[in-house]
Curated annotation (Swiss-Prot):
It catalyses: O-phospho-L-serine + 2-oxoglutarate = 3-phosphooxypyruvate + L-glutamate; 4-(phosphooxy)-L-threonine + 2-oxoglutarate = (R)-3-hydroxy-2-oxo-4-phosphooxybutanoate + L-glutamate. CDD domains: PSAT_like. PROSITE patterns: AA_TRANSFER_CLASS_5. This is Phosphoserine aminotransferase. GO terms for molecular function: O-phospho-L-serine:2-oxoglutarate aminotransferase activity; pyridoxal phosphate binding. The gene is serC. Pyridoxal 5'-phosphate binds at residues 76-77, 102, 153, 173, 196, 238-239. The lineage of its organism: Bacteria, Pseudomonadati, Pseudomonadota, Gammaproteobacteria, Enterobacterales. Its cofactor is pyridoxal 5'-phosphate. Binds 1 pyridoxal phosphate per subunit. It comes from Pectobacterium carotovorum subsp. carotovorum (strain PC1). Its EC number is 2.6.1.52.
Length: 361
């Protein structure tokens, strides 16, 4: 059987070692004779899973002790509502940095609860799409917080700078780049991330929130989205997505065993460099993102002749390269190369691309 490399933007590829271990444990987890999916989330066995998962995540990201880690439902879209309702307090506005599709989606949700100050940071650099540097972001004085998305999966645009806005509360949607590189958590008030891209299976959402931001929720906020309630109940205010939590915990262990975030950052840069070199070195392919803002996680590219898109996708699947179709908003192709994607997968893709260009160029 041809080895399959899954380039899906999410739900995305998981480490093979993690999947194999989960397969082995599926029907008899921890010697209990039952699946981890079947045990109570309040059992001592699962409480140990939860505690180990949180500690490993804290170790990986070096999360300071004055931050809570929440394991939630609802995906990042739920956080689009949770963030303003937890953080606005008596204020009526917040700064929303619009750098792409998902950042703008957060704006659309926030408009239900406040008057967002939308700061469009999209720009053109020598005809290529990019994002203005943070020093040019015109933040307002009365905003309750600053919200931005460091990595846009659809646009393939990344903001690699870390925020330095003094005492402003910074909120970041790290759904597609969490754990891909080292970050300074202390620069943020809230970090949230859907698990299905670079952590584990769909159904789990991580929220990292600074302690002083708890307890400020508006009265109309649903309890299940209230950071204070979730923190007080150790993320078990209701039944959490236990299997997704368990698998994500296994991924945290895998990351630590493979050198942590410093090693992931190195590997991800190597994979991205290889793929962008293949695109830039062949007139048959094109990426229209400025080099400074190119994503290391999601690499969109266009063929010289869009009429060949269907053929490219058919042949790539036959070659074991799956889920390369670009998002409907931008078209073309997109290769998502998260932590679990091995270098061998990217090499296989670039070799296929070179061969396809020779045959169809």
């Amino acid at each position: 059987m041809t080895q399959i490399f899954n380039f899906s933007a999410g739900p995305a590829m998981l480490p093979v070692e993690v999947l194999r271990r989960a397969e082995q444990e599926l029907c008899n987890w921890n010697g209990l004779g039952t699946s981890v999916m079947e045990i109570s989330h309040r059992s001592k066995e699962f409480m140990q899973v939860a505690a180990e998962s949180e500690q490993n995540l804290r170790d990986l990201l070096k999360i300071p002790s004055n931050y809570k880690v929440l394991f939630c439902h609802g995906g990042a879209r739920a956080q689009f509502a949770a963030v303003p309702l937890n953080l606005l307090g008596e204020r009526s506005t917040a700064d929303y940095i619009d750098g792409g599709y998902w950042a703008h989606s957060a704006v659309n949700e926030a408009e239900k609860y406040c008057t967002p100050n939308v700061i469009d940071v999209k720009t053109r650099v020598d005809g290529l799409r990019g994002v203005k540097p943070m020093r040019e972001w015109q933040l307002s004085d009365d905003a309750a917080f600053v919200h931005y998305c460091p990595n846009e999966t659809i646009d393939g645009i990344a903001i690699e700078e870390e925020p330095d806005f003094g005492d402003k509360i910074v909120v970041a949607d790290y759904s597609s780049s969490i754990l891909s590189r080292r970050i300074d958590v202390s620069r943020y008030g809230v970090i949230y991330a859907g698990a299905q891209k670079n952590i584990g299976p769909a159904g789990l959402t991580l929220v990292i929130v600074r302690d002083d931001l708890l307890g400020k929720a508006r009265r109309e906020l649903p309890s299940i989205l209230d950071y204070q309630i979730l923190a007080d109940n150790d993320s078990m205010f209701n039944t959490p997505p236990t299997f997704a939590w368990y698998l994500s915990g296994m991924v945290f262990k895998w990351l630590k065993e493979h050198g942590g975030l410093a090693e992931m950052e190195k590997r991800n840069q190597e994979k991205a460099d290889l793929l962008y070199s293949a695109i830039d070195g062949n007139d048959f392919y094109r990426n229209d993102v400025a080099v400074a803002n190119r994503s290391r996680m999601n690499v969109p590219f266009l063929l010289a002749d869009a009429a060949l898109d269907k053929v490219f996708l058919e042949e790539s699947v036959a070659a074991g390269l799956h889920a390369l179709k670009g998002h409907r908003v931008v078209g073309g192709m997109r290769a998502s190369i998260y932590n679990a994607m091995p270098l061998e997968g990217v090499k296989a893709l670039t070799e296929f691309m070179a061969d396809f260009a020779r045959r169809h160029g």
